[in-house]
């Protein structure tokens, strides 16, 4: 993954919609906010987001070309799996969301079709 591919998504505080972009934490005295910044040709736009919803892009896309983020739930190999960051492996892994849990390194998805069917955050809220 290239440095320009590093991006995040999170839910905006004002309208609860997902927004994608660069992750920015502003610690200016009383203005401490967690924001997602969107940089476009016309300039930058910052959106205050819920810090508990921040998810990192994995560098992968599903069969339909949708970006795969941490916390997404995918349909893969006749089962549902959640994308999770595993500190001990320094990698994104898949964890089964059904009765059995297991870990599979996300790199296996590079050669297999999968579909994003939801995400942990929307499922919980």
Task: Pin down the residues of each PLM region.
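Secondary-structure transition motif
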Residues: 1-125
């Amino acid at each position: 993954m290239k440095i320009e591919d590093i991006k995040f998504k999170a839910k905006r505080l004002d309208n609860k919609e997902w927004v994608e972009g660069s992750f920015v934490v502003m610690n200016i005295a009383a203005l401490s906010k967690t924001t997602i910044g969107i940089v476009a040709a016309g300039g930058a736009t910052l959106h205050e987001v819920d810090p508990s919803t921040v998810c990192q892009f994995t560098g992968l896309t599903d069969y339909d070309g949708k970006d795969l983020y941490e916390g997404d739930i995918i349909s893969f190999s006749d089962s549902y799996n959640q994308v999770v960051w595993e500190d001990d492996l320094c990698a994104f892994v898949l964890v089964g969301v059904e009765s059995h849990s297991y870990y599979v390194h996300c790199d296996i998805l590079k050669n297999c079709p999968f579909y994003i069917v939801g995400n942990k955050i929307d499922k919980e809220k």
